[in-house]
């Protein structure tokens, strides 16, 4: 997966209710293992920059991060690598859009997905701390779910996007003490595919395929109509 986050930092602070005014460079092609912005709950919402690709505390080394960029929402509460983070360290990841690739004629063709009216996206995430011999890594995974009807023709999975009304419920630290079954019952209703009718999609050029490209050209439509 890849995504973009180019909205000005001060706007992110306003939308997510952060006391701190963020200063950020626009990113148009955020890729796994790179640093990403997360929003956590710590006596109020706080920004936290972490590596995208979760490293469990028990991992011998951080090399597994590239395989841990996504956590399936259906099993996140039980998987050993994710369950502690799901219980105690949930976060939001702001984005303007995400990309998915469709296999077609031996090629991978990139598509861009947004919320309607360019509203901000908040991915549901979990985060962890890994430490060995003074080397500390904060890292995260983005939850995924079955794709909605808009994304499904391109890819069978999609990031778990939370509506603004559910941000507090996802971050709520008061649910951290709940038994696994109770927590899953509390958060389970949030773990549904975001409504297709509140999203738009268009194909972008293969320029975005290279992680070395990180500029507005990543969002340029390919030679086809939006729908």
List each model region and its residues.
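Short linear sequence motif anchored by a di-proline
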Residues: 1-227
């Amino acid at each position: 997966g890849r995504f973009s986050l180019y909205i000005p930092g001060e706007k992110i602070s306003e939308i997510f209710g952060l006391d701190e005014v963020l200063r950020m460079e626009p990113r148009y092609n955020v890729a796994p293992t790179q640093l990403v912005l997360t929003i956590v709950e710590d006596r109020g919402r706080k920004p936290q920059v972490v590596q995208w690709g979760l490293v469990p505390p028990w991992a011998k080394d951080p090399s597994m991060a590239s395989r841990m960029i996504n956590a399936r929402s259906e099993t996140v509460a039980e998987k050993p690598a994710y369950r502690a983070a799901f219980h105690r360290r949930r976060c939001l990841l702001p984005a303007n859009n995400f990309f998915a690739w469709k296999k077609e004629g031996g090629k991978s063709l990139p598509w861009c997905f947004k919320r309607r009216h360019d509203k901000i996206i908040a991915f549901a995430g979990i985060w962890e701390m890994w430490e060995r011999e003074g080397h500390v890594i904060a890292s995260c995974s983005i939850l995924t779910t079955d794709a909605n009807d808009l994304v499904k023709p391109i890819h069978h999975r999609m990031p778990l996007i939370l509506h603004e009304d559910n941000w507090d419920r996802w971050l709520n630290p008061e649910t951290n003490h709940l038994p696994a079954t109770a927590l899953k019952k509390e958060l389970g209703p949030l773990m549904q595919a975001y409504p297709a009718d509140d999203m738009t999609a268009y194909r972008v050029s293969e320029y975005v395929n290279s992680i070395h490209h990180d500029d507005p050209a990543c969002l340029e439509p390919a030679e086809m109509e939006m729908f």
